[in-house]
C-alpha cells in the first residue's frame, strides 16, 4: 500500500509531526481515569443515532468522549438529552468546576474546537464520523497515528488512506447498528485484536 502515500503529502506529514508535540490534556486524563475509552470524533447525526444506542446499553467499565462536527448549542443539547449515561459538556466543566469531578462521568461531550487531535491520544478505540454522508468520512489519520484502531461508516471510497486501512484491517467499516455493536464489542473484549489493528494503523501512517 505504499502507493497510497504520495511523497510530500501534507496530511501524513502533519499527523506524523503530532507525535513530536505534547498531547497531554489534564482534564481528559482525569475523565479517563485509566478506564477503556472510545473517542468519537467529528460525528454527524446519522453516526450519533447508532452511537447513542450503543452508549446507552454499554457497561460502566467503558467511557466515551464525543467531539461532534456541529457544536451549536441546540445540537449539543439534543445530543446530551438522548444519552442516558452520566454526561458532562466541556463548556460545563473545564472552567467552572474542579477537574477531579470528571472521573465520575461516563460520557464527555467536547463542545469546543481545536483539541480533538490531542484527545485521540487518549483513545483505546476511535470512531471517526462522516461516513454516512457525502463526501464521506473525516480524517482517520489522526487517531491512526497514535496506534488507535478506527471504526467508520460506509462512505470512504474517495479517501485512499481509509480504503487502504480498511483493506489492511486496521480500520473497520460499518453500515448499521448491528455491525457497529459487533465492531465495538470485538475491540473492547479482544485486547489482542485491538492492539493488532492499532499497530496496523500506526505502521501505515509511518510508512
Predicted features along the sequence, with ranges:
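Nucleotide-activated sugar donor-binding and catalytic core shared by glycosyltransferases
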Residues: 1-207
Amino acid at each position: 500500500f505504499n502507493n497510497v502515500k504520495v511523497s510530500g503529502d501534507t496530511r501524513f506529514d502533519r499527523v506524523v509531526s503530532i507525535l513530536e508535540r505534547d498531547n497531554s490534556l489534564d482534564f481528559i486524563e482525569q475523565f479517563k481515569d485509566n478506564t477503556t475509552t472510545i473517542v468519537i470524533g467529528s460525528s454527524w447525526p446519522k453516526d450519533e443515532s447508532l452511537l447513542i444506542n450503543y452508549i446507552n446499553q454499554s457497561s460502566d467499565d467503558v467511557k466515551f468522549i464525543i467531539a461532534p462536527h456541529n457544536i451549536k448549542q441546540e445540537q449539543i443539547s439534543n445530543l446530551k438529552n438522548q444519552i442516558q449515561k452520566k454526561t458532562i459538556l466541556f463548556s460545563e466543566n473545564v472552567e467552572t468546576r474542579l477537574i477531579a469531578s470528571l472521573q465520575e462521568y461516563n460520557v464527555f461531550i467536547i463542545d469546543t474546537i481545536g483539541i480533538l487531535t490531542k484527545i485521540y491520544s487518549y483513545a483505546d478505540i476511535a470512531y471517526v464520523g462522516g461516513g454516512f454522508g457525502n463526501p464521506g468520512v473525516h480524517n482517520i489519520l489522526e487517531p491512526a497515528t497514535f496506534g488507535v484502531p478506527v471504526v467508520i461508516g460506509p462512505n470512504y471510497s474517495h479517501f485512499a488512506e481509509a480504503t487502504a486501512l480498511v483493506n489492511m484491517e486496521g480500520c473497520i467499516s460499518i453500515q448499521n447498528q448491528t455491525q457497529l455493536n459487533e465492531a465495538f464489542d470485538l475491540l473492547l473484549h479482544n485486547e489482542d485484536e485491538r492492539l493488532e489493528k492499532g499497530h496496523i494503523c500506526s505502521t501505515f501512517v509511518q510508512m
